[in-house]
A protein has these predicted regions:
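Catalytic phosphate/metal-binding cores of nucleic-acid and nucleotide-processing enzymes, i.e., regions
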Residues: 1-106
Length: 106
């Protein structure tokens, strides 16, 4: 799975959020999930989750945060819409990254 967006390989140069994304991507690859990073500028859409996933026929939107940071109001609207239409919406940080594993194991 090459999602078209490469994160820096040197962890010292990575932001805390980028480190969370890297861990999420590793879990997604372990599960052979289809995923990509949506484009948010230009023709893209603002507020969409950081990573869009399809796994075993399920649509999953993953918003990655660091520490106690929460989704912006627009990000939360998008996450709510995903959940309301039958998808799975996750907000993950360093503390709950195992939630991704749990969802993929279901």
């Amino acid at each position: 799975n090459n999602c078209g967006h490469q994160l820096p390989k040197d962890a010292r140069l990575m932001t805390p959020e980028a480190k969370v994304k890297k861990k999420v991507v590793a879990i997604l690859k372990e599960h052979d999930a289809y995923f990509f990073y949506p484009v948010t500028g230009g023709y893209g859409r603002s507020g969409v989750p950081d990573i869009v996933v399809c796994h075993n026929g399920r649509f999953i939107g993953i918003e990655c945060k660091s520490g106690k940071k929460r989704p912006t109001p627009l990000q939360q609207v998008n996450l709510d819409q995903i959940a309301e239409t039958g998808g799975i919406a996750l907000v993950v940080n360093e503390e709950n990254i195992s939630d991704v594993q749990d969802v993929l194991n279901r």
